Amino acid sequence: MAAFTTKQSLLLLSLLLLISLSAGSFYDNFDITWGNGRANIVESGQLLTCTLDKISGSGFQSKKEYLFGKIDMKMKLVAGNSAGTVTAYYLSSKGETWDEIDFEFLGNVTGQPYVLHTNVFTGGKGNREMQFYLWFDPTADFHTYTVLWNPLNIIFLVDGIPIRVFKNNEANGVAYPKSQPMKIYSSLWEADDWATQGGKVKTDWTNAPFSASYKSFNDVDCCSRTSLLNWVTCNANSNSWMWTTLNSNQYGQMKWVQDDYMIYNYCTDFKRFPQGLPTECNLN
């Protein structure tokens, strides 16, 4: 194999640096907010870990607020017996009428699958849960979890595959998050009163500390701000994400996920809504 020239080596170094910068440093983008040392940023800002023990969990939040965007995070979840643990990754605004977009990963006993719990809150109202099993082991390696939020819809994606869409149906009286900036939050915590098999399986603290890892954060395609008056450019030259909806191929992918891996859908829970399903269920 031919040796690299100096020019080639510099080009390769520049490319690697660009890849590193595009992934986003956790030092630059996030603050650890709780856990008393149980959350740590390592590997020169490229990896963040959250841990949970019997005393406390841990968590972090973004420095920026976002009003629409395509946000990626690679995550590797708690391995082994993770029963009773919840790894939450979500966007949320503040106040009593907050908006929120949720990924929550509910742990399970060894050999049993995680449950991916999703929800959308508008004006402080949620009750829009959809739950899934994953088609891979989320503890064996990192996988990418994406929220694409624009004026038209909110799309939840796993490794680029859409699993759920919440459309803007304001014209039909359904509230839609479009005016309240949100921060990104994530935490690892214990909720064994409900998280695993409805609370039947409790956390086995002999397996603690539990740990989840994060890397390759990407918020390049976003409208964001770092202060009330400091809005960052919304990448006007590359903002195809701002008007993205699912194409026919992506609808096919989502149908595959929902047919084969969905385990709960609020839009089919007639017992929960005896007076009639939420309006959007008949529109989406």
Swiss-Prot record:
Q: List the disulfide bonds.
A: 223-234, 267-281
Which keywords describe this protein according to UniProt?
A: Apoplast, Cell wall, Cell wall biogenesis/degradation, Disulfide bond, Glycoprotein, Glycosidase, Hydrolase, Secreted, Signal, Transferase
EC code(s) of this entry: 2.4.1.207
Q: List site positions: Important for catalytic activity.
A: 102
Q: Name one GO cellular component term.
A: apoplast
Residues where xyloglucan binds: 104, 117-119, 127-129, 193-194, 198, 272
Instruction: Provide the protein name.
Output: Putative xyloglucan endotransglucosylase/hydrolase protein 13
What is the originating organism of this protein?
Arabidopsis thaliana (Mouse-ear cress)
Q: What is the lineage of its organism?
A: Eukaryota, Viridiplantae, Streptophyta, Embryophyta, Tracheophyta
Q: Which gene encodes it?
A: XTH13
